[in-house]
Amino acid sequence: MSTQDRKLFDLLDGFEMTKSEYDWLERRFENMTAKESMLFRGAMQIERPEKTFDVLQLINQLDHYELFYGAGDDIGLGHFVMNRIKHPASSARAYLDPAKVGAAFRQQVGSAFCDGHFIKISSLTVPLLDGDLTQYPDKGDYGIRVKLASRSNMEGIWVGFPDTSAYMDSSHPDELLLALDALEVETLTECIAVDVDCGLPQLRDILSQYDSAAELIRHAIDFGYAVSYTHL
């Protein structure tokens, strides 16, 4: 079990679960990207589930939560809101207190600060039908995923595309930034790609076609968005 998996299972300490639920969660945690892991931890803080069934409901609806990268407190959140969401006039910015803007925004919706970022509910979750929720897919809905490793993290971290948050730089998506943070590196030149999982099974041996992680990730970002447009 990887370090990420152990940290996620620690959140479920004391939860009763069947073997099939445990096995599914183990696979799901192993397949989580860095961003999914962050969303899950934030959602656990927001929802505070008390039963394994509720955790499975939550984990199958992570797309109902949104991450604001780097907005780790009210001040950071206030700057994020003013720079990327509300865009107040320059004449008004001098009179706005970022901490108060951030606090006001935070109090409007279910939310939590998590490891230097802000997680909020973006849409209401839909109760899934009672039954065996472990029959749901054990990995996120990505067009392509790449597993990166570094000297500091040889276990590797999955990063998935497309990443479609409305408030991020599409050329530097939160998925990638969070993966670099988890790998304790600043650039892709410090990483190696160790695995690829593509939504199109006819595309094979992708890893062997690239000499660098940077080139592979650049094409994965483009591929992920292309796949997302075909699903519109």
Where are these regions (language model features)?
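N-terminal interaction modules that seed assembly of large macromolecular complexes
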Residues: 1-29, 156-158, 162-213
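Ordered, amphipathic secondary-structure segments that act as subunit-interaction surfaces
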Residues: 32-39
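Extracytoplasmic/secretory-pathway segments with low complexity and glycosylation-like composition
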Residues: 53-61, 65, 69-81
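Acidic, proline/glycine-rich low-complexity IDRs
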Residues: 75-151
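Internal, hydrophobic cores of structured domains that mediate oligomerization or house catalytic pockets
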Residues: 45, 52, 108, 128-177
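Conserved small/polar residues in nucleotide/adenosyl-binding loops
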Residues: 230-231
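Extended, well-folded catalytic/binding cores that form a central cleft or groove in large enzyme
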Residues: 28-31, 46-47
